[in-house]
């Protein structure tokens, strides 16, 4: 059945812009009901690709988590490139790696641009807690698909329970 969008759907992207230094909380998924992004080969490929795009000066990944069926990132744009274009590069380069595993990306993505002065801590915490809240590991364990930039980890780690979540964080929704 074709998706039918209500009035105003096409206007959602009007007025959107991307500029150097803007921070975006991004989420993109595998097509449902696929899983497998956390397989070691695929996890390594995902990390290599976000590093490659960083080295190409498209973005700086501040923190990210790779889950079995989706991925969350907090990025800072580093080039005059639309965020959607960077995501297309990312997903496009990874498509060839996913194909032999019979995996493919969902077409769309979620993005939220952080406003100037908006506290990034809630996004860092959300990304950090994602595998714990999904029940994929216990509070005292570390998730292999989690990444935090070294500079950001210096301050964020001090707000954790020695690199793992405080029990009360897991109770927050």
Which residues are covered by each model-predicted region?
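Short catalytic/metal-binding and nucleic-acid-binding patches
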Residues: 1-173
């Amino acid at each position: 059945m074709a998706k039918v969008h209500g009035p105003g759907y096409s206007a959602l992207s009007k007025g959107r812009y991307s500029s150097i230094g803007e921070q975006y909380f991004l989420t993109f998924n595998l097509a449902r009901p696929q899983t497998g992004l956390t397989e070691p080969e695929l996890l390594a490929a995902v990390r290599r690709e976000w590093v490659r795009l960083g080295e190409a000066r498209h973005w700086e990944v501040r923190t990210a988590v790779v889950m079995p069926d989706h991925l969350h990132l907090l990025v800072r744009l580093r080039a005059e490139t639309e965020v959607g274009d960077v995501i297309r590069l990312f997903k496009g380069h990874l498509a060839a790696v996913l194909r032999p595993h019979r995996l493919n990306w969902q077409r769309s993505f979620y993005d939220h641009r952080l406003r100037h002065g908006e506290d990034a801590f809630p996004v860092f915490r959300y990304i950090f807690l994602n595998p714990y809240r999904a029940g994929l590991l216990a509070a005292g364990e570390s998730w292999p698909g989690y990444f935090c930039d070294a500079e950001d980890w210096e301050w964020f780690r001090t707000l954790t329970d020695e690199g793992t979540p405080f029990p009360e964080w897991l109770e927050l929704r």
